[in-house]
Amino acid sequence: MIALEERGAETNRMAAISAVVHTVAISREGKVKLERVDIAHDTGFSLVNPLSVKKQLEGQIIWFYNDAMHQAITIKDGHVVENNFNKFRISHIDEAPPEINIRFFKTGHWLLGMGHDRFTSVQSAIGDAIFQITGKRFRDLPYGRQDLSWT
């Protein structure tokens, strides 16, 4: 995903320039694995704490994988099934991509945020990989509730 946006000091929008490549594998049984993620990310005028930003970006990749594969709220008989943390599925550490490569570049533009809006491309990358590998196109998340097996 490449996101470009005109930015300046007076805007109220979150903005950043980034390019992200996701390498996704799907076993014949339908197990999805993010094998590698490569990120090039704008630092704006300056980056005060690169390690902090790097960890923020890594966390976002893992959390958006979680969104794509597991997160859902189920209503049964008028009640929420996942009504406590022990019933709400989240990703485990072994589901994290073993390789996340992050490179920063400086555009000299204003950087207005490093929040959780950076890598929604994880869901679409996994969805596209599912389609390319299995021939099945899903339009609803989480993908983990779908039959992802293929022959």
Predicted segments with their positions:
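Cofactor-binding beta-sheet edge motifs in enzyme active sites
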Residues: 1-151
